[in-house]
Amino acid sequence: MPIGVPRVPFRTPGDRDASWVDILINRLYRERLLFLGQDVDSEISNQLISLMIYLSIEKENKDLYLFINSPGGWVIPGIALYDTMQFVQPDVQTVCLGLAASMGSFLLAGGTITKRLAFPHAMIHQPASSFYEAQAGEFILEAEELLKMRETITRVYVQRTGKSLWVISEDMERDVFMSAAEAQAHGIVDLVAVE
């Protein structure tokens, strides 16, 4: 838990002992404000997925807001989170604060089209694929699966950005850092907040 987040004791009816509740975090969740401020891994992905599903069941016509400041992360938990964003009934508005790199960029692009925003000084980084980093034995065993995941991510970017397959494929072959305005021109976000 972050330093300075207020907590209060709360007793659930029927429980003998009180437990500590994070007031601020619960309040933000009730307002449908979700935060990805770390690498995408199984734990944060599962937390965000469960919150999105719970909040969409609770009120299916009120938008969810996913604030992203992430250096990237694991592919499979990221794709699971992306799929959930597409599945839930409410629109998911994505907002880039600071950095949305690799899987963070993928999730930023996965927000509801016309509701993807980046702050003016945000940096967006397209995912780069570096298959050569794995050891040879692992590479041979996992190459087919890696190629399938790469194709999936590439197709999603093509669909979400409106760019051609060759442009997205070329971008994924090299490190591409973009400003918020460049990300808007590239179709990853729809709006750039004004200063």
Swiss-Prot record:
Superkingdom of source: Eukaryota
Cellular location(s): Plastid, Chloroplast stroma
The keyword Plastid is annotated on this UniProt entry: yes
The enzyme's E.C. designation: 3.4.21.92
Active site positions, chain numbering: S102 (nucleophile), H125
CDD domains attached to this UniProt entry: S14_ClpP_2
GO molecular function per UniProt: ATP-dependent peptidase activity; ATPase binding; serine-type endopeptidase activity
PROSITE patterns linked: CLP_PROTEASE_SER
Subcellular location, principal: plastid
Top EC class of this enzyme: hydrolase
Keywords: Chloroplast, Hydrolase, Plastid, Protease, Serine protease
GO biological process, one term: protein quality control for misfolded or incompletely synthesized proteins
CC terms in the record's Gene Ontology section: chloroplast stroma; endopeptidase Clp complex
Keyword Hydrolase: yes
Reaction catalysis annotation: Hydrolysis of proteins to small peptides in the presence of ATP and magnesium. alpha-casein is the usual test substrate. In the absence of ATP, only oligopeptides shorter than five residues are hydrolyzed (such as succinyl-Leu-Tyr-|-NHMec, and Leu-Tyr-Leu-|-Tyr-Trp, in which cleavage of the -Tyr-|-Leu- and -Tyr-|-Trp bonds also occurs)
Pfam family, one: CLP_protease
Function per UniProt: Cleaves peptides in various proteins in a process that requires ATP hydrolysis. Has a chymotrypsin-like activity. Plays a major role in the degradation of misfolded proteins.
Assembly information from the UniProt record: Component of the chloroplastic Clp protease core complex.
Sequence similarity: Belongs to the peptidase S14 family.
PANTHER family according to UniProt: ATP-DEPENDENT CLP PROTEASE PROTEOLYTIC SUBUNIT (PTHR10381), CHLOROPLASTIC ATP-DEPENDENT CLP PROTEASE PROTEOLYTIC SUBUNIT 1 (PTHR10381:SF15)
The protein, known as: ATP-dependent Clp protease proteolytic subunit
Organism: Phaseolus vulgaris (Kidney bean)
